Each structure stands twice: as C-alpha cells, then as structure tokens.
C-alpha cells in the first residue's frame, strides 16, 4: 500500500468522492509513474479544506493506492521524483485486529456495564476472543429510545431510564457522531471501519476533515446496535457469543467488594438476571461505586451554553467569496480565547447546519446538546461555548461534588425556563450588557421545546458567566460576527465531559477493586465516541490478558 498526501484540488474538480478519485488516479499515475492497469485500488483517505486564503479556498486530499504487486509498489516508491518524496510513503495496512478467540476461555462471563461506544467495543472485543460477555444497559434499544424521545418532544413526558442520554448506543446515538479525535493514542480505531463494514455509514464521511454521522444514522447501524424488534435480551453484533440486556440497571451487590469479582452480579430489569463475572468493565454509576468504596476522584470538566448563529454568516466568515459553493457545504469552526483571568472560553461539538437538542435525563433538570443531520442544511450553526470547572472551583472534596454542581445548574435552568421543559435563552447583546432578554432577534432558536427569554446568569457558576462575558468579544475578533448582538445563548450545556474519574492504573484496573475495569467517557478516560471506542477495546484487552 502506498500513501500519497498533500494533493491540492479545486472546489470544482473535487466536489464529490468520485471526482476526488479521478484526481487521485491522475496524481498516482504521474507521481508513481505507473499505468492505469497497474493500479489495483485507490481510496480517498483524507479530505480537508484549506481556507487560510479566502481567495483560494481549496481541498487537500490524501489517497491510499494499492498496485497489482508488492514488487511494483517498491519500484514505484523508489522511482518517485525528489520533489514528491515528502508526500509519498509505503505503509502497512492499518486494519485493526481483535484478539484471537481463546481456546481455554473461562466459564465465568465478563460483564460490560453500559452500552455506549466504550461498552459496545469492549463487548465486541471480548466476544471476538470467545469470552461471551454480558452487556448490560439501563436504557432501551435504539428504536424504543426513539419512541421515548418522540414522546418527550411531543408531550413533554420524560422517561428517566430511556432518553437522549441513556440507552443502547449511549448519548452519541442522538447527537453528532464525530469520527475524528484529538487523542494522542495513535492506534488505528476500528470504529469508522466497523461502521463502513456494516454498510450503513455514508462512504464519503470516513475521510472528511470533520467527519460525522448524523443522529438519524445511528439507530440504523446494524453492526453496532441491537435489533429494534427484540425484548429484554436483544440480538446484537455479538449475538453469536454474548447476551445484551437492555432496560437493565445494575443494583448493589457484593460483587464490587470482593478482591476478585466471583460473586453473583445483581441487576434490576424487566427480567432479572445474575452472573458470576470473570471481570467487570464499567462505564459510570458513580453513586453505586462510591457506596462500595471504589476509588473515585474529581476531575476538570466544562460547562456553559449552546450558541447559535446563522449558518450563512459562519460560511462567509470561514470561506469568504467561496461560501455557498456546493462542494463545501456548511462551514464548521473551532475557537478558543485565553482570558486575562487565567481561564479559557472554547467552542466544543460544533454542529454545522444543526439544531440545539433537548438532552435532559432527569425530571426537573434541563440540559442541552447539539446535533446536525447528514445534510447539514439547517438555518443555524450551533456549538457549545464552555469554560472549565476545576476541582478548586468545587465547594468540597467529595468525588461527586462536580455531579452535584451539574445537577444544581440543570435544576436552575429548568426553573428559569418556566418549569415546563422550555430552555432558558438570552441574546448575546443582552448577556454582555447584563440584562435579561425579552424577545428574539433575527436568529431564531432551534431548541425543539421552545425557549423562555431570560438572563442565564442564575443557571451557571459566576466564574463561567464572567468568563463568557470576557471571551465572547475576543472570539468575535477571531471569527467575524461571532459576538453579534442577536446570536442566541441557550442553557445549559453541562454534560460535555465527566466530572469524575474512576481511578485506574496503567493496566486499566480500578486501583481499589481488582477485577473492575473503568472505561470510556463516563469513567473519565475519553472525550468522544472515537476515543471511547478505543478505550473500550483497550480495557477489554486488559481483562483478556488477566485471565
């Protein structure tokens, strides 16, 4: 396999994947000095937008080329001209591999608690190794989750056990599925490849600079998510070797107090079950862990608001005269401002052409998130606008103090919205002036249950409010119009990251409880679906190595 990088292409000649492949084949023949018949396959590996010069917005592409024989590939790489050597290299196929099935797998079945990205890929890895894991998830399968969410949006009736946060697939099922990651772990992730393998992910999305899957895609991803037609024990990608229990909640049990979990694992479900686990991979349930003396620690997390602008304004600010070109689509952004008070304000989970979503999971507690559909053609752009909360900002050293702060902010947001699931909202101009908003401007909020115009100060800690007021004008200097007076702030965004770490060692063991393997975003070891999937695999491999 040969990789060719730094291929410049105009917007018109690379407007879709087929056009990109035509460019790639032309470049491959020239750079590798090969014939059409010698190219066995070519794949668009990366596609990013270079908008540093607004008068010359173009794509930068990279390709992976397979010739008809390894000998030809070696000759082709050796023959590359000096001017092209820096962007051509021979590579090994980075298809990630799962552990080989164990011939002497123990009778005890490992238990994976939580079926988000970490839990799903932990279970998949264990199943590939022949260990027949039990996968437990408090919420419903994706189809029933969709029904519960529809009921919430239509009737304002929240199901605390099945909602945007809880259910098979995790919170990412009904938010943006961003297929990029900032993690320093260079290990190839199987996540996008498995999505493609299932035939349900848009092929073009895999190599894009800001690749994502829309929430409408997630419930249909058959290789990852269990069937919508089953009952409490549902079929899944690992149906041949594991069991998945949806609508099942972990209950107190001696399992978490033993030196090695061998006692029955209790659960609360429509149909009860128990297990003598070989090990437990756990994604959250902090109160249960604290009650059983599992070591927890506070960690830095972030809270703030969702900010909305007209997408056309973001397009013009990012792409200049090229804004609106069909090859570009809706423009994303990523911003940060470092403040005189030593803190930072930053955007997170930006959703081009998206909407603000109702992400609440607890009665009388309101929080928001964002999502884009595949077309990214909504009128508004939105992103979380966040400020960090450090352990020093918390009132005490209780490991769950951050969770209590989150809950207090969500309860305040619910009250400010009118205690009817309306979200509190404020215009940027009013927020900067310190006055409550009364009516919208030209930017119409997209939160689906409606907003109540107010002042959002009461729903956030004072240091976050002050930092947002300092940061918005600075961000307006970085992206024209970002601090426009009628941009909409909707509160509150509290769930961007976990405020708690379930402390583990380098081998992924919970330091206080052998046989327990904390993993994923909820346990404090990931920051998105890609890093969570990778961490789930890592912890599963650690469990396998310990058997």
What are these regions (language model features)?
Residues 1-59, 65-174, 178-547:
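Residues forming the flavin
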């Amino acid at each position: 396999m040969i990789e060719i990088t730094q291929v410049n292409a105009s917007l018109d000649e690379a407007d879709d994947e087929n056009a990109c492949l035509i460019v790639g084949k032309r470049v491959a023949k020239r750079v590798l000095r090969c014939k059409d018949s010698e190219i066995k396959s070519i794949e668009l590996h990366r596609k990013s937008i270079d908008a540093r010069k607004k008068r010359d917005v173009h794509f930068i592409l990279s390709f992976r080329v397979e010739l008809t024989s390894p000998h030809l590939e070696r000759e082709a790489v050796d023959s590359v001209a000096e001017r092209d050597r820096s962007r051509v290299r021979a590579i090994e196929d980075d298809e990630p591999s799962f552990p080989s099935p164990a011939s002497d797998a123990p009778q005890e079945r490992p238990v994976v608690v939580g079926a988000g990205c970490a839990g799903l890929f932990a279970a998949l890895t264990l199943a590939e190794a022949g260990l027949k894991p039990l996968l437990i998830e408090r919420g419903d399968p994706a189809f029933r989750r969709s029904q519960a969410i529809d009921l919430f949006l239509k009737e304002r009736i929240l199901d605390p056990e099945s909602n945007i946060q809880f259910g098979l697939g995790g919170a990412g099922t009904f938010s943006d599925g961003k297929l990029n990651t900032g993690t320093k772990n260079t290990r190839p992730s199987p996540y996008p490849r498995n999505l493609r393998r299932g035939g349900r992910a848009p092929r073009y999305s895999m190599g894009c600079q800001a690749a994502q899957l829309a929430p409408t895609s997630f419930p249909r991803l058959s290789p990852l998510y269990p069937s919508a037609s089953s009952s409490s024990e549902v079929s899944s990608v690992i149906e041949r070797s594991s069991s998945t229990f949806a609508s099942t909640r972990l209950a107190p049990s001696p399992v978490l107090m033993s030196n090695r979990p061998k006692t029955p694992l209790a659960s609360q479900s429509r149909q009860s079950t128990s297990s003598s686990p070989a090990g437990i991979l756990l994604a959250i349930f902090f109160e249960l862990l604290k009650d059983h003396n599992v070591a927890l620690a506070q960690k830095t997390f972030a809270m703030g608001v969702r900010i909305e602008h007209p997408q056309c304004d973001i397009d013009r600010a990012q792409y200049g005269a090229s804004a609106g070109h069909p090859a570009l689509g809706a423009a994303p952004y990523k911003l940060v401002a470092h403040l005189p008070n030593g803190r930072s304000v930053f955007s997170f989970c930006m959703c081009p052409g998206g909407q603000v979503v109702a992400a609440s999971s607890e009665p009388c507690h309101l929080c928001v998130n964002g999502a884009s559909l595949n077309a990214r053609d909504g009128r508004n752009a939105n992103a979380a606008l966040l400020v960090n909360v450090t352990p020093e900002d918390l009132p005490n050293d209780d490991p769950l103090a951050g969770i209590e702060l989150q809950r207090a902010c969500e309860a305040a947001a619910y009250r400010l919205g009118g205690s009817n699931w309306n979200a509190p909202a404020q215009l940027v101009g009013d927020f900067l002036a310190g006055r409550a908003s009364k009516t919208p401007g030209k930017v119409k909020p997209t939160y689906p249950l409606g907003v109540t115009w107010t002042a959002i100060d009461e729903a956030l800690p004072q240091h976050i409010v002050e930092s947002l007021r300092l940061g918005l004008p600075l961000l307006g200097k970085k992206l024209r119009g970002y601090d426009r007076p009628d941009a909409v702030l909707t509160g509150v965004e509290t769930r961007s990251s976990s405020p708690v770490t379930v402390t583990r060692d380098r081998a992924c063991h919970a330091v206080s409880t052998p046989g327990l393997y904390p993993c994923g975003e909820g346990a404090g070891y990931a920051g998105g679906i890609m890093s969570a999937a990778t961490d789930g695999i890592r912890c599963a491999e650690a469990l396998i190595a310990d058997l």
